[in-house]
A protein has these predicted regions:
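Short coil turns that delineate tetratricopeptide repeat
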Residues: 6, 39-40, 73, 107-109, ...
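Glycine/serine-rich loop-strand microenvironments at binding/catalytic pocket rims
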Residues: 66-81
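Structural signature of tandem alpha-helical TPR/SEL1-like repeats
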Residues: 21-31, 54-67, 89-104, 110, ...
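Long, contiguous interaction/recruitment modules in multidomain scaffold/adaptor proteins
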Residues: 1-11, 17-23, 27, 34-37
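A conserved position within tetratricopeptide repeats
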Residues: 36, 69, 103-105, 139, ...
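Terminal, low-structured helical/coil segments at or just beyond the last alpha-helical repeat
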Residues: 1-9, 120, 124, 128-160
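Conserved alpha-helical positions within TPR/SEL1-like repeat arrays
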Residues: 13-21, 43-54, 77-87, 113-120, ...
Length: 160
């Protein structure tokens, strides 16, 4: 691949992200796809999946995350995202292993997300002690992560 194609792929990815943040999801999808055609990256597949999720297309979102993992299995984001999408589908037992893979991944800037999501799985499956551990671990990593604080508060009220 030429350096010119690589640079264009990056520009298309950045434009796709900008469009996604502006709520222009259909256009964002087209730009992500064009970026992937020029230079497939785990990030582009993951963000395309995230865009599908915002459209309620969870199966498509999961499929893109699986493609991301095939491109770069060290990136943690797609593992976490698959877990989160499975949670949205009520498929808690399937979500857990994906979240554990995110936690074990080598490349991830936000490890508090899979810990929080694993806590959600544990809470939904009545594993309250483990849920507490997961929410606390998320807060240890990111002390001001509101969803984990709120989940821990709900859990305390639930088990009193």
């Amino acid at each position: 691949m030429s350096a010119q194609n690589y640079e264009l792929a990056i520009e298309l990815f950045q434009k796709a992200y900008q469009l996604q943040m502006q709520g222009e999801l259909e256009l964002a999808i087209e730009f992500y796809k064009r970026s992937i055609e020029l230079h497939p990256t785990a990030e582009a597949h993951t963000f395309l999946g995230w865009t599908y999720r915002h459209q309620g297309k969870l199966d498509e979102a999961i499929a893109e995350c699986e493609k991301a993992i095939a491109v770069d299995p060290t990136l943690g984001n797609p593992y976490n995202d698959i877990g989160a999408y499975l949670i949205e589908q009520g498929r808690y037992e399937e979500a857990g292993p994906w979240l554990e893979k995110a936690i074990a991944s080598k490349r991830y800037e936000a490890y508090h997300y899979p810990w929080y999501n694993l806590g959600r799985v544990c809470l939904a499956t009545d594993q309250y002690s483990r849920a507490r551990e997961c929410f606390r671990k998320a807060l240890e990593i990111e002390p001001r992560y509101r969803p984990a604080e709120e989940a821990l508060d709900r859990l305390r009220r639930l088990v009193q």
